[in-house]
């Protein structure tokens, strides 16, 4: 498949969420939450969600290596990703240079090339979520990415302005001059 979707569950009713996936032809979910559970929205707990999606013919896979909320990554020069002023995004961009991230991305790339896949997290708005950086990584590998916002609204992803795709297909986000 040439297109990968991203979607945030946002605590929506599960039927609405499944409808979003079906409307976009999604057959597989890649859950990129570091902790795949929710006290406020138990319908999005890993096992419950897996069961619900299976009932609609949608596969589920948790990819913890792509989860957000990362700490500092040693040995990454601070200027490599200085474009990101938000500490969470900066740390995640640093983390994207690790073997652990590369391993998770390889799983996602394999899945996405086999079946229509959506990268899922909790945050509804892609620009406030680490899915935006995962979208950049997918773009670096030549895939198209579409952010699903609602039944009537989706947006094609574009590489973050200022992002640099390096020869090994990793990314850097240097500060703008």
What residue spans do the PLM features occupy?
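Residues lining hydrophobic/aromatic ligand-binding pockets adjacent to catalytic sites
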Residues: 1-177
């Amino acid at each position: 498949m040439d297109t990968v979707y991203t979607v945030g569950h946002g605590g929506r009713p599960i039927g609405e969420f499944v409808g979003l996936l079906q409307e976009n032809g999604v057959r597989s979910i890649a859950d990129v939450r570091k902790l795949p559970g929710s006290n406020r929205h138990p319908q999005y707990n890993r096992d419950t969600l897996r069961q619900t999606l299976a009932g609609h013919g949608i596969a589920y896979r948790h990819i913890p290596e792509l989860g957000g909320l990362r700490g500092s990554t040693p040995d990454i020069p601070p200027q490599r990703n200085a474009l990101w002023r938000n500490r969470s995004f900066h740390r995640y961009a640093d983390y994207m240079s690790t073997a652990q991230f590369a391993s998770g991305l390889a799983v996602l790339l394999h899945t996405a090339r086999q079946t229509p896949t959506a990268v899922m997290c909790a945050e509804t708005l892609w620009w406030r979520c680490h899915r935006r950086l995962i979208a950049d990584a997918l773009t670096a590998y030549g895939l198209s990415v579409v952010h699903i916002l609602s039944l009537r609204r989706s947006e094609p992803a574009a590489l973050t302005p200022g992002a640099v795709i390096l020869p090994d297909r990793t990314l850097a986000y240097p500060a703008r001059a």
